[in-house]
């Protein structure tokens, strides 16, 4: 265990060091302007990338544990789609001209999507995992339709920024967004740690968990609530960076399959490393253009998702 943590910490430290050092502009550490670029632009962006990656990975492993389904992640369950739909509608209504309003609407969209998925998946007195996944897929299709209509009605001047946000971007990262996402992630991990033993028992099935005294519906509510809130916050500030919550938990389980309490920080470290590295590549692969982070995570995630689907 200690070796796995050490390896992930070293990889994250290397990724952060490289991401801070390299970019579209070379930094001279003796130059005042370079130090300002580092403190106001590059460092908050790199730390936000780490926070976003950790958040999505923690949400992903929580969804997979609750649903006992290896294909579950915030992107597939419709949480990310709800946030994107909220942002698209806000853009169509020209709310983007009010600073900070689009992320707030996106966050609200993520929470509404979570509530809708839960209501659709509810069956008598329990939540059906299969219905939950199907509900997420159906809602994603609905959100896609609303997004297309919203973009068709959006003013041209706001459309470019909205499209970049949809593809995942950390451009314009601020210390405020770093603190917001990191704080929510810390609170969520503490909350999930308190129900970690119950989540571990849920892996063996709801009936077995109930027989051992677990309040299954309460644990589901806490788990889904915590994972959805941090996902909404992450998507609100970075747009859609898909497949992190799917890819990272599976890779981490190759080295650690036991206690859920230790799986959470391992996934957080792995997710942070992946998104920091993806952001670095998106900034330097083409010098004059910043590519969307979501494209790189999708390139890694789609083949992995298909292999999981085939095995399942």
Predicted regions: what is each one?
Residues 1-312:
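Alpha-helical transmembrane segments in inner-membrane proteins
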């Amino acid at each position: 265990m200690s070796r796995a943590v050490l390896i992930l910490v070293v990889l994250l430290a290397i990724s952060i060091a490289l991401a801070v050092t390299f970019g579209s502009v070379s930094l001279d550490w003796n130059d005042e302007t370079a130090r300002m670029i580092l403190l106001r632009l590059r460092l908050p962006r790199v730390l936000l990338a780490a926070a976003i990656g950790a958040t999505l990975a923690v949400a992903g492993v929580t969804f997979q544990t609750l649903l006992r389904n290896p294909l579950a992640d915030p992107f597939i369950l419709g949480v990310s789609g709800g946030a994107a739909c909220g942002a698209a509608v806000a853009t169509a209504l020209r709310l983007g001209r009010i600073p900070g309003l689009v992320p707030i609407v996106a966050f609200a969209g993520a929470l509404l999507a979570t509530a809708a998925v839960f209501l659709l998946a509810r069956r008598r007195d329990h939540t059906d995992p299969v219905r939950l996944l199907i509900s997420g897929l159906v809602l994603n299709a609905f959100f896609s339709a609303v997004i297309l209509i919203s973009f068709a009605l959006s003013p041209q001047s706001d459309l470019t920024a909205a499209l970049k946000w949809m593809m995942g971007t950390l451009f314009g990262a601020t210390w405020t967004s770093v603190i917001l996402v990191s704080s929510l992630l810390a609170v969520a991990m503490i909350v999930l740690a308190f129900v970690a033993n119950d989540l571990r028992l849920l892996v063996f099935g709801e009936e077995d968990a109930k027989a051992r005294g677990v309040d299954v519906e309460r644990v589901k509510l806490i788990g889904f609530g915590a994972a959805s809130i941090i996902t909404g916050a992450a998507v609100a500030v970075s747009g859609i960076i898909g497949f992190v919550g799917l890819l990272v938990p599976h890779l981490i389980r190759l080295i650690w399959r036991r206690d859920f309490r230790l799986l959470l920080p391992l996934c957080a470290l792995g997710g942070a490393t992946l998104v920091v590295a993806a952001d670095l590549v998106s900034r330097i692969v083409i010098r004059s253009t910043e590519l969307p982070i979501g494209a790189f995570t999708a390139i890694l995630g789609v083949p992995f998702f298909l292999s999981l689907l085939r095995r399942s």
